[in-house]
Amino acid sequence: MDQNGMEIPVTLIIKAPNQKYSDQTISCFLNWTVGKLKTHLSNVYPSKPLTKDQRLVYSGRLLPDHLQLKDILRKQDEYHMVHLVCTSRTPPSSPKSSTNRESHEALASNSNSSSDQSGSSTPSSSQETLTLATSSSSEGLRQRTLPQAQTDPAQSHQVPYVMQGNVDNQLPGQAVPAGFPVYPAFNPLQMLWWQQMYAHQYYMQYQAAVSAQATSNANPAQPAATQPLNLAHVPGEEPPPAPNLVAQENRPMNENVQMNAQGGPVLNEEDFNRDWLDWMYTFSRAAILLSIVYFYSSFSRFIMVMGAMLLVYLHQAGWFPFRQEGVQHQAPNNNAEVNNDVQNANNLELEEMERLMDDGLEDESGEDAGEDASAIQRPGLMASAWSFITTFFTSLIPEGPPQVAN
């Protein structure tokens, strides 16, 4: 490009990082050097900064004085953004300095006139006037120290303030006691309340399990369930047993009772309200299974499988119960002993629960597993073989969808 082309003016936008002055638009030429631009800014810029104190930054790069603008500026940009940074030796003067100086002189003259008229002014009043003048001259600056921290440090240590956002936004009314953390964790009372709630829920679940086990063993569940709640029970005032306890003991109990979440057995409405589509689906599955057995085996095997499936179905329906019910047949004269044993067992279990809660409920799972293992009798060889066979043939029979608890 020739010399005439270098005389084309270029528009620069000078920005101040402290936002003290607005953006200044400067017109210059491409053949200017950075040093010449600084000299021009020292005459044109509002703060009149010295050339040696100026630092020009363009596109994140510090511009040295010997470079020309044609080697730095991008040709495709119409406006070029340049940041002007000045050192602290010659800070830019504030445009409000004259008004602050006038207000300071007015306050000083007022203080002098008031002191001359009174003639007995104290040093504290003059100090307060100077403090007001100093605060008015330092308008716009942020206070980063507490006013009471310098005057009374002991009081500031005794009553710590809660920090909210800036240091300027401290509220003296939001004080906390000494020695208490500013952001405390859970209160000890809250921790004790949570532990009590956990122990209560665990105790309720344990009582539900004990009552269900007592119901399955055909014990008088209604008197036994109310014994743990009656802590003020006197042994000599025990009511006589009801006459229908013998009939309840001799009555066979259904051990496979599904419990509802709200209490009580689950009513399987799907067993009573099964539509024709459900029945067709069940019969189709059974027909497919029997057809596979019939076409891929002999007639004798087909009859054997049909008989086994029929026996398993009748067993599931309750026609052939194989469970021993010797525990259910007890003498009527042992009702009082059974009630006392159940009461003593419940009291021992309640004491065990209190001991576990005092220990922190650390080894609850191990103890429960040990008690369950000792309470359950080991099945014999014939019972294991029968369970294996029934489980195998039961898996071959199609069943309906699983029941969903409420």
UniProtKB/Swiss-Prot annotation:
Subcellular localization(s) per the UniProt record:
Membrane
Q: What is its main location?
A: membrane
Where does the record place the Ubiquitin-like domain?
A: 10-89
Gene Ontology annotations of biological process type:
endoplasmic reticulum unfolded protein response; spermatogenesis
Biased composition (Low complexity) is annotated at 87-98, 109-139
Q: Which UniProt keywords apply?
A: Membrane, Transmembrane, Transmembrane helix, Unfolded protein response
Q: Transmembrane among the record's keywords?
A: yes
Renumbered to this chain, the Polar residues biased-composition regions fall at 145-156
Disordered: annotated span? 86-156
In terms of PROSITE patterns, this protein maps to: UBIQUITIN_2
What protein am I looking at? Homocysteine-responsive endoplasmic reticulum-resident ubiquitin-like domain member 2 protein
Native organism: Bos taurus (Bovine)
Record gene name: HERPUD2
